[in-house]
Amino acid sequence: MRFTCLRCRTSGSATLRALALVLAASLAGFPVGEAVVHAQQPIQLFLSAVDNDGKPVTDLKAEEVLIQVDGADCMTTRFEAIDWPTKLTVMVDNSPVFNDALRQLREALRAFVMALPTDIEVSLLSTAPAPRFVYKPGTDRVKLMSSIDLITPDSAAPRFIDALAEAAERAAKEKAGKEKNNFFPVFFIVGNNGVEGSSPRDYQVNKLFKQTIENAVTVHIVMLSNSNRQLDIGTGTNQIEVGLKLTQLTGGRYEAIAAQTRLTTLLPEYATQIAKSHARQSHQYRITCQPPNGAKPQRVTAATMRPNLSAALTFDGRIP
């Protein structure tokens, strides 16, 4: 029998809340994530399974999967296949830092788009002088490619944090109360470590963190090191701290680069990672189980007798 596991922390909260990074746990090796679980409350889990060829397994049945809490059976009360899509928000720094690399940035974005699955909904925004749509959410790749040429330099400082906060707010509103037509948001942003145009208060940053966690957002970041400009200590480090924290919380990828030429090869790498994540996240099983009376969940495991499977078990369905 093969299994995968998650570690939990008990809490007095009445609902299951993912408050720390939840990592997909492989059947071969078991990296473990955490979540807050209230004793006696039903536990909701997401199980993603693929075969030896990496193709999603779409015919698992409830009787083939055993959920246990701290070694005791957790009775499955609901077992359903989900096919939630990925919705990708791409945010691009168009401040003076990228003036000399505008052609490279556009070429990198085109390569990025070409590497994405065509069924992923994409939106494209620039971040200076404020976050604004260059291409609104859609799947028309011809129009998206044409929109890349509309990214033009602006003399103002980029608003890296504001762009992420607004994207998180949109995702939260779109997902609010949705049982049908749910989705997994992914944010990809290109920024720089120079002066930041956003001036967020602590509560606004905390809201950004909270919304990304609660809505199973994955955040990926490319940060260009701007050696030719002096950092503004008051604002120039804010986007770095926020960016690092977001990628740590959501399991995303953070890359600091020194040369603009790296964009051409790096952005397609991100697209490939997003494509793989999309394939796994979009075909999962949402499982609800009831822990035994008196249980104070610390460890949740899933086991199956089905051979030749590789699986990921999470509390929110996010597989970066």
Give names to the regions the model predicted:
Residues 41-43, 248, 259-320:
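C-terminal "exit" segments of structured domains
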Residues 129-130, 137-220, 226, 241-244, ...:
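Exposed acidic/Ser/Thr-rich ligand/metal-binding surfaces
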Residues 17-31:
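Bacterial N-terminal signal peptides
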Residues 36-97, 106:
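Eukaryote-biased intrinsically disordered, low-complexity acidic regions enriched in Ser/Thr/Pro
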Residues 1-14:
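N-terminal secretory signal peptides that target proteins for export/translocation
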Residues 81-137, 160-167, 186-190:
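Von Willebrand factor
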Residues 98-100, 132-135, 195-203, 228-233, ...:
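Extracytoplasmic/secreted cell-surface and envelope-processing proteins
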Residues 220-279:
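Von Willebrand factor A/integrin I-like adhesion domains
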